[in-house]
Amino acid sequence: MSSARDLIKVDIEWGMERLVRAQQVVELRPYDIESWSVMIREAQTRPIHEVRSLYESLVNVFPTTARYWKLYIEMEMRSRYYERVEKLFQRCLVKILNIDLWKLYLTYVKETKSGLSTHKEKMAQAYDFALEKIGMDLHSFSIWQDYIYFLRGVEAVGNYAENQKITAVRRVYQKAVVTPIVGIEQLWKDYIAFEQNINPIISEKMSLERSKDYMNARRVAKELEYHTKGLNRNLPAVPPTLTKEEVKQVELWKRFITYEKSNPLRTEDTALVTRRVMFATEQCLLVLTHHPAVWHQASQFLDTSARVLTEKGVRTSVENISPILCVPVVNQIEWVMAFAWWWAKDVQAAKIFADECANILERSINGVLNRNALLYFAYADFEEGRLKYEKVHTMYNKLLQLPDIDPTLVYVQYMKFARRAEGIKSARSIFKKAREDVRSRYHIFVAAALMEYYCSKDKEIAFRIFELGLKRFGGSPEYVMCYIDYLSHLNEDNNTRVLFERVLSSGGLSPHKSVEVWNRFLEFESNIGDLSSIVKVERRRSAVFENLKEYEGKETAQLVDRYKFLDLYPCTSTELKSIGYAENVGIILNKVGGGAQSQNTGEVETDSEATPPLPRPDFSQMIPFKPRPCAHPGAHPLAGGVFPQPPALAALCATLPPPNSFRGPFVSVELLFDIFMRLNLPDSAPQPNGDNELSPKIFDLAKSVHWIVDTSTYTGVQHSVTAVPPRRRRLLPGGDDSDDELQTAVPPSHDIYRLRQLKRFAKSN
């Protein structure tokens, strides 16, 4: 299947650099939503025949996004290309369960079929089709209501036709009032009124029969509103980006589907529960179609439902077989027929769910995830469980035919399937095919050799496979280590030592790649060899390491490998660092920790690095402490500091002159407050009239006064010798002033409070 870039074929003369650049971006990055939006906005202003290639590319890249299909169809409808509209609906309508797209479909049928003689039949079929597919949507109220209004508006001639009309309306009402949708209360009121108009006596009976199911559906509708709050059903489906918004949407969809799986309607109808869960899953796949977990979970649910129904059918057969044997032979035929009907019903439903599970997995590997091996493997295992081996072979071959994938893991799983289903000979034929594929890596030889050893119990065949792989992957230290592990497992000491010598002396491994093999060789000799062989391997390894720059001068670090065992080391982690052992072999020091043992005492030492880090505060929320000489009490959590001013207030204070620029006159605060205390104010302000000699013209006095400023007394510069010249204050980010520009203002000469304090101080002396 072609990639997303190959699906973009836009042939439009934009005439603007901005649009040309947007097209170049989407050709490079097909899922760039912003660039697509730029072109879509321009395309909506042009005729459809000029921009049809854009819309085709759009729906090919985003095949599950209902919003883009809706834009495309609306453009075709606007130009009255109804044949194209019907083809577009055939391509997308059944696959995309989006309420807005289905409403557009009903609008199209209503507009285009109104002139036909069979208009009413066409509309009724369209409504039935829509409600069958989208009727469980939480926001499908308008479709239910429109269908009811349509049926009630149909003219009925004769009693038979009238009864048919009433039956049809009642049937739709009764389905609607037990379906959890927003606005179900209004439908219930309309239904009760409808039954009252027909027959008040029957109405009460109908309401009593349906009220319990209605209350249950209304409760679920309220809960669904909560569980679906925040879901964006119109997001374009793009590959996972792990953004915060995407993670949130994934969690919301999981919560929605989990809620549906909990059977909120509390029904015993397994088919209804499965339908509702799959409806929610299908809507989720419109947005998260690039997420393989959603596809896999959907298939798992269907598979589980099929198994439950199968077990239910078996359990029913066991429970009903005893009563059949106890009845007379004459009546046993009726019992057997009833039993067969119930058993066949469950089995048939289970088969439908199993086929739907296969359909879900088939859609997943034929869609945008056609290169996802996980879904191929899950599908293959499912079909293997149904004994459809030919289909499994077809799936594996289909995946292997993709040119731009690594087929190694596919061959490994293919061999395992062939061995399980058809025996070891079939697996060997797959291994032969894998060896001939130049894309295959060393893993296929390891998998084939271990399969022969564990399944056919023939270690000689496994030896030959490993030797065959060594000719091809002798320069791969990973493959060599797998071969060594196999020989060690067999306890073949001589063969293992020979393999070490062959690999290390053949020259197939570069010095850098041979480090791991040398370390393993030393470990091997430390476990089973004598001291002379250990020292010999150490010397040979040191000779190789001398040519590597990163191992120069670390002879002591190389000695550690002789005495270590698993995660036990002869030095503490600090000492290992000091001798360069961590840099030598890349050990994880936090694993050493207390496991390191002292050479002298042998006791476990406590490593300071193993101590968990202390929690640190959020420094962005801390208040800067800036002491001021005359800080008001309570202005800061700590004495002597002040809160930073808001940005607007700080900007205003920066434009005001400094306090020492004001030289008087100064108001006597005590006299001013004494006047306020003795002042008797009326309850209400006097109204100006001729009797109290108050006139509105008095308040116009300020307008007639010309204020004269003596520029000789104040020019913006202090003339007093004792006054401290003002300094400009620099506004810092955050609305505070610079600390180095703080200054202490000179007290005014007419400060009454200061004079009184001086007099009291003189008297006390």
Swiss-Prot record:
What residue spans carry the region label Disordered? Answer: 595-615, 727-747
Q: Which residues carry this modification: Phosphoserine?
A: S738
Q: What is this protein called?
A: Protein suppressor of forked
* Annotated HAT repeat ranges: 46-78, 80-111, 118-153, 164-197, 230-262, 387-420, 491-527
Pfam families per UniProt: Suf
Chain's role: Essential protein, may play a role in mRNA production or stability.
Q: Which GO terms describe its molecular function?
A: mRNA binding
- Residue runs in coiled coils: none
The primary site where this protein sits is nucleus
User: Does the keyword Kinase feature in the UniProt annotation?
Assistant: no
Entry-linked SUPFAM superfamilies: TPR-like (SSF48452)
Assigned keywords, A-Z: Nucleus, Phosphoprotein, Repeat
Subcellular location(s) per record: Nucleus
How it assembles, according to the record, is: Probably interacts with an RNA-binding protein.
Per the record, the GO terms for biological process are:
mRNA 3'-end processing; RNA 3'-end processing
The record ties this protein, via InterPro entries, to:
HAT, Rna14-like, Suf, TPR-like_helical_dom_sf
Keyword Protein transport (UniProt): no
Question: What Gene Ontology cellular component terms go with this record?
Answer: mRNA cleavage stimulating factor complex; nucleus
